[in-house]
Curated annotation (Swiss-Prot):
Coiled coil: none annotated. The gene is mshD. Residues 320-348 are annotated as: Disordered. Belongs to the acetyltransferase family. MshD subfamily. Residues 12-156, 169-330 form the N-acetyltransferase domain. Acetyl-CoA 1 binds at residues 91-93. GO terms for molecular function: mycothiol synthase activity. One of its GO terms (biological process) is mycothiol biosynthetic process. This is Mycothiol acetyltransferase. The keyword Protein biosynthesis does not apply. NCBIfam families: mycothiol_MshD. Catalyzes the transfer of acetyl from acetyl-CoA to desacetylmycothiol (Cys-GlcN-Ins) to form mycothiol. Transmembrane segments: none annotated. It comes from Cellulomonas flavigena (strain ATCC 482 / DSM 20109 / BCRC 11376 / JCM 18109 / NBRC 3775 / NCIMB 8073 / NRS 134).
Length: 348
């Protein structure tokens, strides 16, 4: 997120999958920004949705005219409009094209998309919780509504304990083409109140199974009498992309831990986390990360007991709660000229 003071050349928007060349442009913009800022401006799901025809999103693209009549992609926003109550956006602006109104224009368009359903709120992720992001949020009437923590542990210093599974529970690896429906049912129940994870569709799961990092051997299912009770899904980040590790070091991730509500209270979450940590340690990894909501104090306490410490924070901004002095103030007045002082961008 950064200040902008001059408008971009043009904005276009579309639904469905982006044309392959445009999707590649967005990925290139994302990687350029990662190298510049040290923080990924877009999370995994928006990147997967770039090429998903059924994704419930609006793509907003900011273009800058270059020599010969060609156009260069200098900004991108993705607005998740799959909910009737909250639209969620992630934004990125090219480092060399900031302070030109691009971010403000993208944010204004995102606000318009959210407002297509009366009363729907716009929430915007700002990855890294940088000081500039907080300043921009304050200038545009946004407040923090959620924090997502990245936590990390050195498993050579904090080796995982032996998993204490309930009697009769057996663990096996996920079988592609066989276990998707059962896993999705338990995942939806386990994350019924989670705004992103609980909505994972068959297409979302298939997209992850097609990713280079997917390894069914690291996707462990806990069953009793053939009934799925929970799972731990791990991931390995290559050294060129890994957060929190030494340069070039592969880093493991406890990607998803889910327990069916009927199996909660049996210590399944702790046991599954220990299984995931042991799997990643046995692969020769030293650093393991995970992401958890700051509001999930029980999980945070469990992870800290296992040696995890907070290493990064992503922040979601949204309108002030009802009853606060700023309640009712627009996030962005979409009639504002993009070149007005104080223009800003999220995720850049």
């Amino acid at each position: 997120m950064s200040s902008d003071i001059e408008a971009p050349t043009s904005l276009t928007s579309m639904r469905g999958a982006l044309p392959p060349a445009v999707a590649d442009d967005v990925r290139a913009l994302h990687l350029t920004t990662v190298r510049h800022d040290g923080v990924p401006p877009l999370s995994e799901q928006p990147l997967l949705w770039l090429s998903d025809q059924e994704a419930p999103v609006v793509h907003v693209l900011a273009w800058h005219a270059v020599t010969g009549g060609a156009q260069e992609l200098v900004g991108y926003a993705q607005v998740d409009v799959g909910s009737s109550t909250t639209a969620r956006a992630e934004l990125v602006v090219a480092p060399g094209h900031r302070r030109r109104g691009t971010g403000r224009s993208l944010l204004a368009h995102a606000a318009q998309e959210a407002a297509s359903i009366p009363g729907r709120r716009l929430h915007v992720w700002a990855h890294g919780d940088l000081p500039a992001a907080r300043a921009t949020a304050a200038a545009t009437g946004l407040v923090v509504v959620r924090e997502l923590w990245r936590m990390a542990v050195d498993v050579t210093q904090h080796p995982p304990g032996a998993p204490q599974l309930p009697p009769g529970v057996a663990v096996r690896a996920f079988v592609p083409g066989q276990d998707e429906d059962a896993w999705r049912r338990v995942n939806a129940r386990a994350f019924a109140h989670h705004p992103e994870q609980g909505r994972m569709t068959s297409a979302d799961l298939r997209a992850r199974e097609s990713e280079p990092w997917f390894d069914p051997a690291g996707f462990l299912l806990a069953e009793r009498d053939g009934q799925l009770l929970g799972s731990v899904w791990t991931k390995v980040h290559p050294g060129s992309e890994a957060p929190d590790g030494a340069p070039g070091e592969e880093v493991g991730e406890i990607y998803v831990v889910g327990v069916d509500p009927d199996a909660q209270g049996l210590g399944m979450g702790r046991a599954l986390t220990a299984l995931g940590l042991a799997h990643l340690r046995d692969r020769g990894l030293r650093t393991v990360i995970l992401y958890t909501g700051a509001e999930n104090t029980v999980a945070v306490h469990t992870y800290r007991r296992a040696g995890f410490a907070r290493t990064a924070v992503d922040v979601m901004y949204g309108p002030p709660p009802a009853g606060s002095p700023a309640h009712g103030t627009p996030l962005v007045r979409v009639t504002d000229t993009p070149s007005s002082p104080g223009d800003a961008t999220m995720g850049s």
